[in-house]
């Protein structure tokens, strides 16, 4: 199954918002248009048996290819995404974005979303151009709440929206907006895993420099490492649960492979 197929089928999408959720199973990417009499050569899988029983003659559903997808993405540009054990988390996020837009075909649109706007209309048919086109001022810090608000205002209902980041700075009052997005769009959140999730490679008296600024001199021992491990796991669990409650499909962004991380959120082998 391809990533596009998974999106058309609403694969692994939560149904926490009931009837307000816009995206239901979209079959094989086709939409029903009308009924007509069956003729030899028609796809027998399209026979409508209820209509056949009512009319007494075989009736088949006429279907047309479903509307094109709009693939939108918000990617965290904050300084904390520029850290990692072997490479920056931002590189894995870029891989996930490439795979996301790589699922587009000729009639689909690709849209980057930022705090200042979205990809210009003229670039939305070109996945590569949409991926590279700036939507924010590089000198301005990443603003997650503003980016989510732009998505709500600018994207059409039913858009497939991907949000990739560590999301450390999402305030609790944003939960309502996340829920609105989850009801309006087919949303997927990839939560960047802390690079030192498995073990904090520090010991003794050390000086720490925060990715977002600030310095501290602390002692790191066995108890401190255990407390750190508990904290990063709890933070990741809480973020995944928070997005899931808001009707977002969720996954974990692993530093080693952004493509595989995106695919895992949909339960498929590779995002293609």
Region spans (language model):
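Short, Gly/Ser/Thr-enriched beta-strand-loop segments that form substrate-interacting elements
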Residues: 47-48
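Exposed, interaction-prone extracellular/peripheral surfaces
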Residues: 1-24, 37-42, 51, 60-272
């Amino acid at each position: 199954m391809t990533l596009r197929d998974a999106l058309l089928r609403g694969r692994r999408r939560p149904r926490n918002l009931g009837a307000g959720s816009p995206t239901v199973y979209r079959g094989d990417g086709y939409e029903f248009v009308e009924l007509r009499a069956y003729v030899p050569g028609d796809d027998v899988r399209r026979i409508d048996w209820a209509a056949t029983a009512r009319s007494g003659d075989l009736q088949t559903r006429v279907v047309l290819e479903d509307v094109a997808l709009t693939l939108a993405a918000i990617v965290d540009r904050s300084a904390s995404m520029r850290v990692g054990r072997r490479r920056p988390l931002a590189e894995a996020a870029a891989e996930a974005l490439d795979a996301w837009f790589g699922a587009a075909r000729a009639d689909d649109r690709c849209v980057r979303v930022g705090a200042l706007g979205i990809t210009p209309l003229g670039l939305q048919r070109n996945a590569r151009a949409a991926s590279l086109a700036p939507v924010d001022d590089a000198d301005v810090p990443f603003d997650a709440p503003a980016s989510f608000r732009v998505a709500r205002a600018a994207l059409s209902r039913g858009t497939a929206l991907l949000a990739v980041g560590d999301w450390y700075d999402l305030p609790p009052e944003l939960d309502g907006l996340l829920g609105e997005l989850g009801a309006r769009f087919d949303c997927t959140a990839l939560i960047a895993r802390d690079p030192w999730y498995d073990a904090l490679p520090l010991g003794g008296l050390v000086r720490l420099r925060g990715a977002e600024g600030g310095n501290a001199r602390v002692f790191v021992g066995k108890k401190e490492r255990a407390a750190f491990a508990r904290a990063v796991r709890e933070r990741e669990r809480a973020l995944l649960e928070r997005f899931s409650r808001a009707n977002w499909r969720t996954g974990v962004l692993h530093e080693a492979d952004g493509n595989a991380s995106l695919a895992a959120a949909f339960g498929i082998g590779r995002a293609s």
